[in-house]
Amino acid sequence: MTVYNINLGIGWASSGVEYAQAYRAKIFREMGQEAKFVFMDLILGDNIEHMTSKIGFSDDEIIWLHNYFTDIKIAPSTISLAEIETILPANPERKEVAGRLIRYHYPQDDMVVACNLRAMDEDAVETVSYFVNDKLLRKDFYSYTRYCSEYSAPKDNQAKVYQRRFYNEDGSTAYDMIVGDNNQDIYRFPDQVLYGKQEFLRYFFKR
């Protein structure tokens, strides 16, 4: 039997609730009781693994709702800058380093690609953002592979996300999330379409 613990989100400044859950995970481990800790929020500000491992969860104890429908494991960001450079457009005119942010400039295409490292003293890349004419068009999220892409379009002088794509390990699309207003997102799977977060949650709990 597996014990499932349902949570909403997690952040770097975790509340007592998350620490209590991590303590509960430790107790379950000592008892030999299998347990999973489910996080329901869309968590893309940072790789969820970096936050859950920081307070004591094991990676195999974590289920993240939006990752659950893929075959990508919960894991730290380990893909290197050198690996990312192999998939970027060739021959940038200039490479600019500013702390954790590495920018590649392609003025011939009015494009800048910005790689955000996990930490100042690490080579692991967390996100890669693509700007054209100073407008954010796409942002890719990485652990040991790309697990999500976020597509944006300019609106009211800001980048408005209109679609998120979640991937499998082989790079194929697991499902698309079409971003709507008032939490009316559409989740498009190969075999069905779900309308709104409530249908998405029901589909998850049926699995």
Stretch-by-stretch model annotation:
Residues M1-P76, S80-E83, Q163, Y167-R207:
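Long terminal segments
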Residues T86-Q198:
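Repetitive, compositionally biased segments used for assembly/scaffolding
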